[in-house]
Amino acid sequence: MDIKINDFEGPLDLLLHLVSKYQMDIYQVPIVAVIEQYLAYIETLQAMKLEVAGEYMVMASQLMLIKSRRLLPTITEVSSEELDPEEDLLSKIEEYSRFKELSQQLGYQHDQRALLFSKPKQELIFEDAVLNEDKSITDLFLAFSKIMAIKQEEVKNNHTVIERDDFRIEDMMDHLDTVLNAKTEITLSEVFKDCTSINEVITMFLATLELIKIQAVTVFQEDNFSDIILRKENR
C-alpha cells in the first residue's frame, strides 16, 4: 500500500502553513505554539520511520533555541547589533509568504495562457485527499502529530507497556468500520483513545488514511483548531 503525505517545499513552507492557520498577522501569532507544532510534526515523521530532510532538522534546532529563549528568564538583553533569532525567523516566513504568493500568481497566469494557445498539459503530480473546504491530508497529519506527542508521553510514563509489532492495517480498518457503523462519526482523538503503544497508534493512523483513500469515510474539521471528525460514507 502506497500512502503519500503531501510534501512541503521546505521548512519555511511548513512553518507558513502552521502560521496561516491562526489567520492573523505573522508577527502576532503565538510563536511557541507554532514551534511545538513543527517539532511534533518532525517527531511524528521520525516515529513513523519516514525520511526527514536535513534542512528540516536544522530548522528544528533553530526553533528549539528560540523556544528556550522564550521560556527561560531573560539573563542578558540582545544588543541592538545582534539579530534576534525570533524576529529573523518571522521575517523569513513573511518574505517566503510573499514569494510563494507571487509564484502562485505567475503559475496561474502561465496556466491561463496555456489554455488559450495550446492544449493543457495532462500531468497529475499528486492528487491530495481532500477533507472539506481548504482542509487537506496535511491538516489530518498535523492533527495526528499532536495526538502522537500525547501518546508518546503516555507510553513513556507507562512502564508496563510491551510494544507489539504485529498490528495489521486491515484489522484496524475493520475495527474503525465497525465503530463507524455503530456511531456514524467519531473524532480523531477517539480513534486513538484506546491505543496503548506507538506501533498501534501508527498502524491505526495508516488504516485511517487508507479508509479516506478508498472513500469509505469522509473527514472534516469545523475550524482550524477543532478536533478532526471521521464520518461513515453512505455507499
Swiss-Prot record:
Location(s), subcellular: Cytoplasm
Keyword Cell cycle: yes
Predominant place of localization: cytoplasm
Annotated Gene3D superfamilies: 6.10.250.2410, Structural maintenance of chromosome 1. Chain E (1.10.10.580)
Keywords from the named record: Cell cycle, Cell division, Chromosome partition, Cytoplasm
Superkingdom field: Bacteria
Cytoplasm as UniProt keyword: yes
GO-annotated biological processes: cell division; chromosome segregation; DNA replication
One Gene Ontology cellular component: cytoplasm
Subunit description: Component of a cohesin-like complex composed of ScpA, ScpB and the Smc homodimer, in which ScpA and ScpB bind to the head domain of Smc. The presence of the three proteins is required for the association of the complex with DNA.
Function noted in UniProt: Participates in chromosomal partition during cell division. May act via the formation of a condensin-like complex containing Smc and ScpB that pull DNA away from mid-cell into both cell halves.
Family that this chain belongs to: Belongs to the ScpA family.
Protein's recorded name: Segregation and condensation protein A
Species per Swiss-Prot/TrEMBL record: Streptococcus uberis (strain ATCC BAA-854 / 0140J)
Gene label: scpA
